[in-house]
């Protein structure tokens, strides 16, 4: 008898959890005992790029996408009604959206707590309603290389602590709805998120980590105002176009902040044009002088990183920077 065969099932489940679902499924050929053992692992990971071997142009072969969908269906069927803790799905155009919806609803019905979705379809894809009303989700990651839409009028995610959004639409009024719908949210990461609101407020008494990274993203609108009322925040990464105003910046417990205010070349030239004594900031670029409101709102931070553009727009006449103080 080999060493692995003598181990209890619970330990084998744990070992298999370190493999991708495809790799775990390959163990079923080892023996009768292993045949369906992988089906009881509560951690499922499906990545069509791994399954389809894009380097071999396998995706273009007839029937290969169907075989991927059949594989996911078969694994979920083998799991029956058993608990699924983590479900990761990464798929691109060609995989049927009805299948994707069915898979997501399947794992939500079985109490999944960690849901990681990267869905890259050519057409705008909307996640099923069940994602926004899950009472078991603790971690939710939603991403795409294009644009993804999953918002709805009613959201309720009472257990959610970590939310990561990549290339998602935030329609008018939905950001505030989102924060209210996630009363336990401690970490929010927004990358390439498109604002539709012109006035946004990040308000949360328990949020601890906030990342706003819109580098390379063309928002639908330029923000007229962006406020932060997050007294429990300890980490803040902000990379976005300069808002016209920062009326409130309440981040009194901040430990680390990284600020990169993005300016177009035209805006940079306009900033430099302010050396003309006949001009003031708002004559050139509305709200340019309000960047200082954001910087002064970070006065309690322990570690502060400012990009060159941020320094330039915050200190309009700065030609020399010398820091004196006790570190």
From Swiss-Prot:
Q: What residue spans do the LRR repeats cover?
A: 116-144, 161-192, 199-230, 235-261, 277-308
Which SUPFAM superfamilies did the record assign?
F-box domain, RNI-like
What Pfam family is a match for this entry? LRR_At5g56370
Q: Which CDD domains match?
A: F-box_AtFBL13-like (cd22160)
Keyword list (alphabetical) reads: Leucine-rich repeat, Repeat
Give the F-box domain ranges: 1-47
Q: Which PROSITE patterns does UniProt cross-reference here?
A: FBOX
The membrane-spanning stretches of this chain are: none
Coiled-coil stretches are: none
Q: Which PANTHER family match?
A: RNI-LIKE SUPERFAMILY PROTEIN
What's this protein's name?
F-box/LRR-repeat protein At3g58900
